Amino acid sequence: KQLTEVYFKTDPVVYDIYDGIRLLSICRTARDRMQNLAFCYQMTGETRYADRCIEEMKAVCNFKDWNPYHFLDTSEMTEALSFAYDWLYDYLTPDMRETAKTAIIEKGLNQILEDYRDEPSGRRRTWKWAQSPVADNWNLVCNSGLLQGAMAVAEDVPEIAAEVFDGGLELIKKAVLLYGPDGAWYEGPGYWLYATSYYTDLMCCLDSVFSDTFGYLNVPGIAQTGYYITSITGPCGNFNFHDSDIGSVNSPEIFFLADKLHDAALSNLRMEQMADRGTNGTIRDILYYNPGLSGTAATMQKDYYFRDTEVASFRSDWDDSNSIFLGVHAGKTNVYHGHMDAGSFVLDGFGTRYASDLGADNYNIRDSVWNLYRYRAEGHNTLVINPSKDGGQKLAGAARIDRFESGINSGYAIMDLTDMYKDAESVSRGFKLTNNRSAVIVQDEIKTAEPADIWWFMHTTNDIEVAEDGKSATVKGKYKNLKVSLLADTPGTFSVMSASPMETSPQNSEQNKNLMYKKLAFHAENVSEITIPILMQFVIPIEGLEENYSVPCVPLSQWTLDETGASEKPMLTSITVDGAELPGFKSDRYVYAYRIAADSEKMPEVKAEGSGEVSVKYTASVPGYAVITVNDRVDSNVINQYIIKIDKEILKQAPEGVSQLSVKEVKASSVPQPENSPENTLDGDLTTRWSAEGNANIVFDLGESRSVKYLGLAVYQDTTNDGRQQYFDVLVSEDGENYTQVYSGESSGTTLEEEIFPIPETRGRYVKIYCKGTSVGNWNSLTECTLYGN
C-alpha cells in the first residue's frame, strides 16, 4: 500500500520508444502499477485502487501498439494488462472489459501468432526469436506473457487462444531444458531472474486454470534452481557473470518452486532471505507462499558447483552478512549475453566486495561487443596473454572446471582455460578458500610456445595501495583490508590501472568509462612458463592487529582439502558489552554491529572469554571499533580476531533542542538522469529523488558556517521494496575545497521515511554526502536530505 500511494501523485504511462528500440521501461512501469493497484483492491476492497488501475489500463489500451518490433515489450504488456483484466474483472464496466480484451487480442495474441506461423507478413522484429534453434530468456518471457494473455481471454476467442497454447507450450520445451542439469542458467543471474519470473508466473497460471502444469515442472534442474540462485549470491550481491548487473536477486519465485516441489527447506530459505538479509516481500511472495511448508530449516552446502554453465561458489558462512564469498566462472564465450570472462571471479568479505564484475555495457552501442571493454577479457578478473585487438579469449573457446572439492574447512575448484587462449599450450587456474575459510588463493599455471606477455587483472571500486617492491598490494575495505601477495618468488609486479582499454585494444568512445572502478594488475613479461600463486587475506587496518597467514605454493595437481580442523583456531565463547551479552553472538561469527544511545559519547566496555588469551583494543571515539584478539595458549602466533563496529542509534526524528538548517544551494557530482536532480532531496516529497551511479556525492551549501549534529536521510526503494541499504560518508568543509570526513554509515533498508543519523558535532559551511552504492547495486538514490544543528 505504501508503494501504491506514489501512483496517485503521478500520471498514467505514455507511449515512448525511449532509445529508438524499446518500450520496455514503460511496460514495466505499467506492469508494476497495475498489478500493485489491482492487488491492493483485492486485499482491501477500496475502489480508489481499482479506479487508479483502470486509468493505467486505459492508457496502455490506447497505445498504437505494444512494440512487437522488440517482442519482449509486447509480452510484458500483455501479461500486465491480463493480470489487471482478471483481478478487476467484476469491477470493470462492460465497455472497459471489451476495451481490455480487444487490446490483449489485437496488440498481443495476434502479434505472436505471426511469429509462430512465420509467414511473410511484413512484420519487423529485432530478431526472429521464435525461429531460433537455441533458446534463451526470450523464449520463456515472450511465450509466457502471451500464454497468460490467452488464458485471460480464452472463453471469448477459443480458436486464437488454442493456437497460442499450441505454439507457446511447444516452444518453451527447449527453454526449460536450459535449467539442466543442476539448475543454473547460462546467461547469468540477472537473466535467470527474468526468465524464471515469467516461467513461474506461467506455471502458476496453468495450475490455476487447468490444475496441471503439463510436465514443465518435472525437468532436470528445476528442483535445484532455487538453490542455484541462492548459492551464487554473496553478502554484497550476486556473482554477476556475463550480462548481469551487481545486486541481490530478490526472488519470490523460490516460494513457488518450494510449494510445487513440496520443498519445505527451500521455502524456509526464502523466509531467511527476507528476515535476515534485508529483502522485503513482494506481491508474489504473498501469492506463492505456502504456510504449511514452514518450520524446516534449509541445510545449505557452503560450496556449490553447477555443471555446463561451469560456475562455482564458496563461502565461510550462510548466516553472517560479513562472511567471505567467492564466486568463480569458466564456461563458454559464444552464448547469448556471453562475455570473455572464463576464469573470472568476485570476492566478498567483511561487508566489502573486493573483486567486482563490471556487468554489461549499453546494448545500443553500434559496435561488436568484443570491441567493448566490459565484454573483453581485459574487462574481467582473469588473464590476458599477449594483449591485442582480439578480445583476449577465443570466441569459440570453452573452459571447464576439472576438479571441485568441498570440505568442512576449505573448498577449491581448478579450471582448464587452455581452449580460451590462442597463444597458450596450457592454462590452469585454481581457486581455494583456505585457512578455515578465512583466506583465498588464486593460482595460475601457464605455458606458452613462445615467450609471452602475461597480465592478471582484478577490478574493484575500492582504493588500492601497491607495496614499493611491487610484490604485494592492499585493497581497502569497510571493516578489513584485503592483502594481496605472492606465495613464491614469481617474476613480475603488481600495479594499479584504470578500468579502460589497453593501448592495443579497440577504443570506442561510446562505451562506459567505468570511472567508479580501477583494477589491480600483475604483469610478467617475456615468460613461456610461469606459476602465479596469489594469496588474499583479510587484515584489520589497525596497527599491531595484523593477522598474517602463510602457506607454501603447491602445484595445482597436488591440491587437496585442508587437513587442519576449525577447532585448532582459538575461538571466543562469549562477548559482553557494558555487562550485557552481545546480541547475535556466535563463536564462528567475526563481525558485529552495536549501537549505543544517540546522546552518548563514551565507548562501551567490551569483555570476552574464549579458548585462548583474549585482549581488546578500541578506536579513540564513536563511531569506531572494538577489536578482540584471541591468541592460542600454546602457539601465540595462531590468532583469531573479532570486530565490533560501534555506532550511535538511528533515530526516527531529530531530538529536541536542534533546528533544521536552511540550505542555500545543493549540487551533485553527477546528474545522469535530469528528472532525478539534487534539488529533489530538498522538496519534502518522498516520491522524487536524486540518483547517480557509483561513487557519487551531493553537497549542501549552508550559506555560512554552522554547527552540524544530525543528518536526516531518506533512501529510495524500488517497486519490489527491496530493502536496499545506502552506504555513505559525511564530510564537512569551511571553504568547499578541503573536506574532513566526520562519519561513515549506512541506512537501515527498512523504511521509506527519513532516518536521523547522529554525527560528531562539526562546524562547517559545506556538507558533502559521499555515496558508495547500496546493498543491491551501484546506483545511489536519495529522496530527502535534511541537516540539523545549532
Show which residues each predicted segment covers:
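Structural helix-adjacent loops and short alpha-helical linkers that scaffold large soluble proteins
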Residues: 1, 41-54, 85-109, 150-169, ...
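Solvent-exposed loop and edge beta-strand segments that line ligand/cofactor-binding
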Residues: 11-30, 62-75, 117-141, 180-194, ...
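Carbohydrate-active enzyme catalytic cores, enriched for enzymes
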Residues: 126-130, 153, 191-354, 406, ...
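CBM-like, beta-strand-rich accessory domains located in the C-terminal region of large
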Residues: 365-575, 582-588
